[in-house]
Amino acid sequence: MSRRSSRLQAKQQPQASQTDSPQEAQIIQAKKRKTAQDVKKRKEEVTKKHQYEIRNCWPPVLSGGISPCIIIETPHKEIGTSDFSRFTNYRFKNLFINPSPLPDLSWGCSQDVWLNMLKKETRYVHDKHFEVLHSELEPQMRSILLDWLLEVCEVYTLHRETFYLAQDFFDRFMLTQKDINKNMLQLIGITSLFIASKLEEIYAPKLQEFAYVTDGACSEEDILRMELAILKALKWELCPVTVISWLNLFLQVDALKDAPKVLLPQYSQEKFIQIAQLLDLCILAIDSLEFQYRILAAAALCHFTSIEVVKKASGLEWDNISECVDWMVPFVSVVKSTSPAKLKIFKKISMEDRHNIQTHTNYLAMLDEVNYVNTFRKEGQLSPVCNGGIMTPPKSTEKPPGKH
């Protein structure tokens, strides 16, 4: 037999066996079908979405506070089909609307720096309605606390940035809690200042000094426990762009000339402390939390310069700040009716840095004057912003008898 005929015979033999056993052919086909189903099932298991839920680990440090959590898988729960018809359409704010006013930087991209600052504005949230969460608290309690912190800052020659960091920590912490007792406010306030001083000051006051200024109301152990509670509640996010930082930046951008030196102050110290005094007074009012820090600083700058300067320094338009400018009118009238703020000389503080040291004046009395001016505005007796300037309210000795 030739080699070719033997190959043909071997090829025809399995074909004959297949035709002789149809049952075996059905078994092979069933196995192929089963294998295909197994592969499809495995693919579905791989692509199937997992369900998770959040479970608290520890009890909250404070009543109504937050606590650390873990995420656990819940495969037994079915994934429901989302009904998007009940949701409301929202328009998100575009961070690229306002172009960067920053000049070219030798140490980084000015556009990236600017966008990072704007992102912090949306990430570090504050809200004037936090008092709704605390039934025992009244708006003036916050004002009294912040005024006291201003005084502590001046006594220990702390920087303005330190105070505004403490103010931000306090306001954001209160948003995370519920039904805080009014007796806890001083502890929360001094602890916020304690945290801020460790972040900002080169030579921060010692822990015992912060306990000392409370006159025995808060011990060192109380401050340390509250420090941990605040840090956990804020999720260790401690780097906001404060109101005073925005003001510093705007004045610097406006003062820069052809050869900019961004890191060295180029603006007038006198102008800075005048506007800073206005912001100190404004921040005591809880309604200031209705505005972003950037808007507050730009509105204050507008009252002491012009809208053209604000556009150049901040990239904001009149529509962005008009509401805040109008809200700030009574504060401006009270500040301008008092003697202008003067640069103070502090021991061991250089002349170049003295404008950055926080000062204190009788802000609570000034805030009372603001509230009095607001009563006239509500009655239509005081116009908002006019081209000729801002009307000065009557002196306290000239108030009508029925308005006391």
Swiss-Prot record:
Source superkingdom: Eukaryota
Annotated spans, Disordered: 1-45
GO molecular function, a single term: cyclin-dependent protein serine/threonine kinase regulator activity
Assigned keywords, A-Z: Cell cycle, Cell division, Cyclin, Nucleus, Phosphoprotein
Free-text description of this protein's post-translational modifications in UniProt: Phosphorylation by CDK2 triggers its release from CDK2 and degradation via the ubiquitin proteasome pathway.
Subcellular location: Nucleus
Basic and acidic residues bias spans: 35-45
Composition bias type Polar residues, residue spans: 7-26
Biological process, per Gene Ontology: cell division; DNA replication initiation; G1/S transition of mitotic cell cycle; homologous chromosome pairing at meiosis; positive regulation of G1/S transition of mitotic cell cycle; regulation of protein localization; telomere maintenance
Biological function: Essential for the control of the cell cycle at the late G1 and early S phase.
Name of the protein in question: G1/S-specific cyclin-E2
Species of the source: Bos taurus
Gene name of this polypeptide: CCNE2
